Amino acid sequence: MGFEPGSFRWPPLRLARLCREHVSVVVVSPLLLQWFTQSEEDEVRSAGRAIGLDVHRDFCEVAIAQDGEVRSAGRVDTTPEQLELFGSSLDPRDRVALEVSGSAWEVARILERHVARVIVVSPADTGIRQARAKTDRLDARTLARLLAAGELDGVWSPDERCRVMRRRLSRREQLVRSRSRAKNEIHAVLVRRLVGRPPVTDLFGVKGRRWLSELELPLEEIETIGACLRHIEFLDSEIAAVERQIASEALRSAEIRRLMTVPGVNVICAASFMAAVGEIRRFQNPRALVAYLGLDPRVYQSGSAPATGGHISKQGSASARWALVEAAWSAVRQPGPQHAFYQRVRARRGHGIAIVASARKLACLFWFLLTREEDYAHQQPSLTAKKLRLLEIRAGAPTVKGTPTGVWATRQAMRAGERKLAEQAEASYKRMVSDWQAAAPKKKAGASVTPGRASQKPSTGKVARQTTSP
């Protein structure tokens, strides 16, 4: 708490003695307060102009805030040549703000060489979408005014390597969706013609294609199936090419290989996580990472009513959440602490909430593994070696005679021993939770309880095999 002498009717030192028992009190001299205010104004004035850009596909609306006034400055064509010309006309002390869009990062890359700083902001932080009057000119002015007032916090800017991985993963996602649509079209033909379920497991494998070719269907249906099969073959080759590039990049990433030591995590999950997060050390704790990924529950509380948890916030990358949930489904089917955690939450809240909680637990586990630079303690070396060898083959490494996954997959005794160790880790986790629940203090009658909490931190000393285990 700080106040200026003369602001109250009581003497400032007496008022400070009365307040210091409740809050921290600092008595500020008027000259010192004036000096701080003048310093902030001089700093803003020396920072140059604040420029807002409302970026469109064909043009950018420009607005400039200077000396407390905001004015429009026309439009600039969204081409590299015109943006370079526009950037060369700016002062090196200027600052530029623009909203996240498809071309925002390329515009920022061109302008950042000419100005002091380029800030790319989230549309949710500007309030432009909720405005009653919305035009390109007003949007640019709003960005310039907020930037001049220092109320804009730019989103994290990924490096070029991270952007390339994001684009490749997005390309793969679109190709997989197109392949699924082509397969569904063939299934629709079979349903439409009252054809029973295929007698093979993989309808689009060798036996499945042979079965499709032997069906007696009208000519137009046969043409549809043939066209879809050719389209699927083309998409398979495109997906394989993209996955080869992703695998080559993953082999050069120590972080992706470290995440793949966790059972259930493949290269797509690890690459999607790293592409969405980037530098893990910019998150101070696992909770910040969970909130960034949108896996934290929304909390509702008002008045004397207890706080209640709602659905997850779903902020951040949807593809990263999807990858974590898919990895969680695979992880909970294998013995280990993750399986025990899923079973415990499912018994109370159901499988839907339990699998999302498991995905959240995976995100926390990833944070510990990456910040401590260590592999997962409960990994199964044979499965890890198999995943890494398949990753090398997918990246284009030559195959050798013998099993395609190496000697690890052929030693049944070794794999059985690894599974037994995983089962022991799961039992250790269950004992830890049981001891923690027995030693936890009982809730007082009438105390507010926040539902939706999947787990809490165990007491000190009651750990399983590694503190990074979920």
What spans do the regions from the language model cover?
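A detector of single, family-specific signature residues
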Residues: 2-470
